[in-house]
Amino acid sequence: MQTVDLDEVTSRDIRLKVEETMRMKLDKYKDFISRQMMVIMGQMDKASQIFPYLYLGTEWNACDWQWLENNGIKYIVNVTNEVENFFPARLKYLKIRVSDEASTELLKYWNQTNQFIKEAKEKGSSVLVHCKKGISRSSSTVIAFAMKEYGWALSQAIEHVKNKRGCITPNIGFVEQLRTFEGSLDKFKIYLCLTL
């Protein structure tokens, strides 16, 4: 699987790379590829409502005070090393300083992020979970929350979040950690059944 910097890539670059990989000309699909790129880029700019109280988005959503206020967001989970909290005097933050690398240990923070999101929900507030682009770190965190909060299997949680935000792509390391998290949740369910 190839990766590109979405801040630098153009639809032409994508088309040429696909042509190279497929060894065929795609000129007649130029408009289609451009439209699909615009859909993906638009999803990345706009936050996605995953649940009535939970939004998944980017650093741009996190710095848009008007949007935050209009959506009743009083809690923010910032899952980045590189983006600082924009409104610490006005909003409640949970800052998880991690990089988007397969070797990054994100699982150890999920109990903390799940509690924080649940607190926002219980207080009748909305919460934004964001990383830089709303694709990997933050989506993994939201998927982990959905699994814990709703008792969903990993596949169901990924499907739900992907249906709401089509551009999510947790890195392979985070997917492995989500599988581990699913296993620990399953063990806890079995333990509860045995002790009741």
Which functions belong to the PLM regions below?
Residues 1-50, 54, 183-196:
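Non-catalytic regulatory/accessory regions that flank a structured catalytic core
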